[in-house]
Amino acid sequence: MPRPPWSDRHAQIHRGLRVRPLLPPGCGVVVAVSGGQDSVALLRLLVDLQPKWHWRLWAVHCDHGWRPDSAENAAFVADLCQSWGVPCQVIAAETRPTTEADARQWRYEALGDVAQTLGATHIATGHTATDRAETLLYNLLRGSGTDGLQALAWQRSLSPAQPGLTVVRPLLDLTRQDTAQFCQQFNLPVWIDSTNADLTYARNRLRLEVFPLLQRHFNPRVDQTLAQTAEILTAEVALLDQMTEELYAKTVQPQDLSWVIQRSVLRSAPLALQRRVLRRVLQRVMTAPVSFDHGEKLVALMAAPNRSQTDPFPGGWLARVEADQIRLMPKADG
C-alpha cells in the first residue's frame, strides 16, 4: 500500500491533534462533508492521518434541497468518498429548512443521528479560523456578550440529549486561504456552491464585502487576528462560567413556582458576575432570547427599594423586590 501524502499542513494538523486531543486514537468519527474546499480538505487530511491514529471514518453529506443542483452535489460527495475508500451517507431533508438557523439545527441533528447509529463518538466539521472570525464579527454586529464572541470552540457536546457525542473542529488553526491552497496542492476536486455568492445571506455579505474591505484598509490578516481573539475569549468564558456556576448555587433557589435571588450575597460580587447569574435565571423562564435590556431590568433591582418590580418579561414572568430578595414569578392573571 502506498504511503499517504505528507505536507506542512498534514504535519500541522497532526501536531495540533497531539497537543489538543480532539480525536483520540481509534475513535469513530463522522465527518461532515459539503463538498466545498474546507470539508474536502478536512476529509483528505483525516484520511491521510488515519494510519497514524487508527480512526474509524465515515462521511455524511446533508442535502437541504435548497438548490436545483443539490442532488448533483450529493452525488459528487458520494463519488469522492468512494474513491477515497470512506463510507458515505447522504441525508436529504424531508422538509426543506427555511432559514440558515433551521438548516444548521437540522444538519447537526442528522449528523448526531447517523453518529449514534454507527457508534461514532465524534463529529468533525471543516470550520476554519476564517469562519471563526466571521462568526465573532457577525455576533458582535448583532449584539452579543462574551459568550457569543468566543465563536466556534474547538470542541463542544452535540446536545444535552446526546452527551456522548462531541463536535470537533480540527481546522481552526487554518484560514480559508490555507484550505484552498491545500486543495490546489493535491489537486482535490471541490464543489462550488452557488449559494455562497448570494448576497441575500448576511454571512455572505460579511465574507464577500466586509472582510475584503477590512483586509485592504485595516489588517490583511484580520481573520487570523479575530480568530485569536475568539480563542482568548473562549478560555476567559470558561473561567467566567465556572465562577457563575458557583455564585448561582449560592444566590438562586427555586421556591414553589418562583425563583428567589439573594440580593445581599449577589451584590457583593463584581457586576460582570451579577449580570451572568441574572441572565441565567432569565434563561430559565423567558420564551425569547435574553437581551441586554432584559438583564439590566434585573440588575436595576439589585439596589431598588422594597416592592419595586419590573414589567413582565417575554413569557409572562416579572421580578419583584421583597426585602433582601428578588422574586421572579409568573404574572398573576388579571
Per-region residue spans from a language model:
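AMP-forming adenylation/ATP pyrophosphatase catalytic core
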Residues: 2-38, 58, 62-64, 93-95, ...
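Contiguous mid-protein beta-loop-alpha structural module that forms a pocket-lining wall or clamp
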Residues: 173-245, 249
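Secondary-structure boundary/capping positions in well-ordered alpha/beta enzyme cores
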Residues: 53, 121, 221, 285-289
